[in-house]
């Protein structure tokens, strides 16, 4: 299988040989951390809880730049840190958080191909030990609104036969899982 951007993927074997360190942080992104991270996670991984940490409960939008900076600082991440994301539900929420990182200008970012599920299927080890994290001072970029499509943008593009799903400026991607 080939990927459009293989440079943003790391595999489980590579990660097992290249653990987190001061310049490389591993973050598990879970929708359900009680049945994920808290039962066991890859050694050195910190947690971003999708529902609590990334979404503003009032505006139902992603967190603000200031909140993102605080979350990164709490996780010991700087703007130069290599961040590897993985998570439950086939990396759905890790991919969402990847996008949020990109919104705020973080460039050195990867996703562990296969997520928790692949790590588990390979019978790799988990720990329940919390990593020791030294807080950092994260400085993000202003949000890149070019990476977002609002309702108006989507509505404007739907139904235009000359565009199909993609145009020069936009592409709509169906990210629902296949039915097995």
Identify the role of each PLM range.
Residues 2-79, 155-180:
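Positively charged, proline/Ser/Thr-rich regional signature most characteristic
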Residues 56, 62-160, 177-180:
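Thiolate-centered catalytic microenvironments shared by cysteine-dependent enzyme domains
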